[in-house]
UniProtKB/Swiss-Prot annotation:
This is F-box/LRR-repeat protein 6. Residues 1-27, 49-111 are annotated as: Disordered. It comes from Homo sapiens. SUPFAM superfamilies: F-box domain, RNI-like. The gene is FBXL6. The keyword Nucleus does not apply. GO terms for biological process: proteolysis; SCF-dependent proteasomal ubiquitin-dependent protein catabolic process. GO terms for cellular component: SCF ubiquitin ligase complex. Residues 10-162 form the F-box domain. One of its GO terms (molecular function) is ubiquitin-protein transferase activity.
Length: 539
């Protein structure tokens, strides 16, 4: 029986304290005990916080988990062991007990509970700003009580998108799902959305009015409302919202079925503070534009009218001069994929005041439009601060008409034609007028589909090689798809524009095979330059 006893003694002797690991040494080196600092470690960061009551070192926390439970004291604990084992144990010397670190009093709540609430809210705010409040805040609220308290702060719920669950479901099931979601919103609105600023409703069909009523009661700070694919929006709901939310200044009604009377009533109530308005063109758009022409929204800065899925064959008649008088503060005007006609000014009528604050004009269209040099002059004759001009699909615009514009600091010019016109009627020369005027400020230039000759394009793009002051040109995006640009011209542009990050050479008949594609990024653009310098010229 001596062998088991000696084996037991050896086992106990091996229970000596382990040497400290390198991780524990660094842990104590970064935040020594008594220094007033403690470390908080997560999966991807290490925080050093100054706070009274430093955290326990890792070794002590691990030891507290490994400490065995003490046997209960009582009569049963004092029972005598077996006689054989007792005599053998008495013969062998008793080993010294292994020193175990004594853990500090109080449970280890974890690093997440030790972060101050205001810091945790700021961390959550960075994630919300990047990805939105959902689903992150909902998941974070389940981690612990401190995280739930931080995720419940109304300041984090400033931007919310509510999508109806009826997509892909039958109509009856969709109504039930909307009612169920509405019941949840009755609690969320007063408890989470009291500081809501931006709200988006997507594909709501039957419960739009109750939701807007809740918003008016619980969200006084609302500034932006978007209704996308929604039905049943009434005038009472919009007017009530305009009265309850005194800071509401932006309304997006694109792709929603809203009566023109409802929109006009809303603009009459909140028009004095309206800044941005998005609409989808329909037969009722004329009535809404009539309210804008009557100076209903004198502070309007952004106006966008686009075409819905079901294209309207009736062109929109837009009185340009009346719009300039009704919206003198307009900064962005977008008529996207819209067939519209400028209303004739009439004989003897003085030109309008223009848009002195206009910075962006977008008239892009994939269909036939009636935008000419004369119409463009009526729109932009008083806009010296224009930065973006998008005329894609406007085949009637010529370089001569663009040369007369008063803007001198244009940064983006899009003149691409995508198979919407006859190449025989396109201008063959005049592109140097554009680049010579704006070569010092242009960052994006789109000439795709234009019919300029090889020599004309060479002269136009050569303007970027001799910018005033000897500085590098600002050009970073160049679209030459379907043009007659030559390899030597492309090589010169790449060499003279070191900041070029996008170059589209698709369907360029004068370039060698294998190079007719789009290049994205500095490496691909430089690779294109190397290939052009080493490839033989096409026959």
């Amino acid at each position: 029986m001596a062998a088991p006893a000696s084996r037991q003694v050896r086992r106990r002797a091996r229970a000596a304290p382990r040497p400290r690991s390198a991780e524990d040494w660094w842990w104590d080196r970064l935040a020594p005990r008594g220094s007033g600092y403690h470390l908080l470690q997560s999966d991807s960061m290490l925080l050093v916080l100054s706070e009274p009551g430093p955290a326990r070192p890792r070794a002590q926390r691990r030891a507290s988990r490994r400490t065995p439970r003490q046997p209960p004291r009582g009569p049963s604990a004092a029972a005598k062991p077996k006689a054989g084992l007792r005599s053998e144990a008495a013969a062998a010397p008793a080993p010294a007990p292994a020193p175990t670190p004594t853990p500090e009093e109080g449970p280890d709540a974890g690093w997440g509970d030790r972060i101050p609430l205001e810091i945790l809210v700021q961390i959550f705010g960075l994630l919300v700003a990047a990805d939105g409040p959902m689903p992150f805040l909902g998941r974070a609220a389940r981690v612990c009580r401190r995280w739930q308290e931080a995720a419940s702060q109304p300041a984090l719920w400033h931007t919310v998108t509510l999508s109806s669950p009826l997509v892909g479901r039958p109509a009856k099931g969709g109504v039930k799902a909307e009612k169920k979601l509405l019941a949840s919103l009755e609690w969320l609105m007063p408890n989470r959305f009291s500081q809501l600023q931006r709200l988006t409703l997507i594909h709501w069909k039957s419960q739009v009015h109750p939701v807007l009523k809740l918003v008016g009661e619980c969200c006084p700070r609302l500034t932006f409302l978007k209704l996308s694919g929604c039905h049943g929006v009434t005038a009472d709901a919009l007017v009530m919202l305009a009265k309850a939310c005194c800071q509401l200044h932006s309304l997006d009604l694109q792709h929603s079925m809203v009566e023109s009377t409802a929109v006009v009533s809303f603009l009459e109530e909140a028009g004095s503070r309206m800044r941005k308005l998005w609409l989808t063109y329909s037969s009722q758009t004329t009535a809404i534009l009539g309210a804008l022409l009557g100076s209903c929204c004198p502070q309007l800065q952004v106006l966008e009218v686009s075409t819905g899925i079901n294209r309207n064959s009736i062109p929109l008649q837009l009185p340009v001069e009346a719009l300039q008088k009704g919206c003198p503060q307009l900064q962005v005007l977008r008529l996207l994929n819209l067939m519209w006609l400028p209303k004739p000014p009439g004989r003897g009528v003085a030109p309008g005041p223009g848009f002195p604050s206009l910075e962006e004009l977008c008239l892009a269209s994939s269909t036939c439009n009636f935008v000419s040099n004369e119409v463009l002059g009526r729109l932009l004759h008083g806009s010296p601060n224009l930065r973006l001009l998008d005329l894609r699909g406007c085949a009637r615009i010529t370089p001569a008409g663009l040369q007369d514009l008063p803007c001198r600091e244009l940064e983006q010019l899009h003149l691409g034609l995508y198979g919407t016109s006859d190449r025989l009627t396109l201008a063959k020369e005049g592109s140097p007028f554009l680049t010579q005027k704006w070569c010092h400020t242009l960052r994006e230039l789109d000439l795709s589909g234009q019919g300029f000759s090889e020599k004309d394009l060479e002269q136009a793009l050569a303007a970027f090689l001799s910018t005033p002051g000897g500085s590098h040109p600002a050009l970073c995006s160049l679209n030459l798809r379907g043009t007659r640009v030559t390899p030597s011209t492309v090589s010169s542009v790449i060499s003279g524009c070191p900041g070029l990050l996008y170059l589209n050479l698709e369907s360029c008949r004068c370039l060698p095979r294998g190079l007719k594609r789009a290049y994205r990024g500095l490496e691909e653009v430089q690779w294109c330059l190397e290939q052009l310098l080493t490839s033989p010229s096409p026959s």
